[in-house]
Amino acid sequence: VFGGDECNINEHRSLVVLFDSDGFLCAGTLINKEWVLTAAHCDSENFQMQLGV
C-alpha cells in the first residue's frame, strides 16, 4: 500500500483472511453479509476464513 496509514486493532472489522492447508493464502474484504472480495489469485478449493482480524 502506497501512502497508507497504520490502523488500530479492530478498526476495520470487514477484513477477511483466507487460509489453506499450507497456512495464509490471502486477504479480502467483506462487501456484504454473504460476499468477500479478494484478488483472482486467492482461488483455492479448500480454505477457511477468519473475519475481523
From Swiss-Prot:
Control of this protein's activity: Inhibited by the small molecule serine protease inhibitors phenylmethylsulfonyl fluoride (PMSF) and benzamidine.
SUPFAM superfamilies, per database record: Trypsin-like serine proteases (SSF50494)
Taxonomic lineage of the native organism: Eukaryota, Metazoa, Chordata, Craniata, Vertebrata
Protein name: Snake venom serine protease LmrSP-4
Organism: Lachesis muta rhombeata (Bushmaster)
Source organism superkingdom: Eukaryota
Annotated family: Belongs to the peptidase S1 family. Snake venom subfamily.
Modification after translation: N-glycosylated.
UniProt keyword annotation of GTP-binding present: no
Annotated S-S bridges: 26-42
Compartments where found: Secreted
Classification via InterPro entries: Peptidase_S1_PA (IPR009003), Peptidase_S1_PA_chymotrypsin (IPR043504), Trypsin_dom (IPR001254), TRYPSIN_HIS (IPR018114)
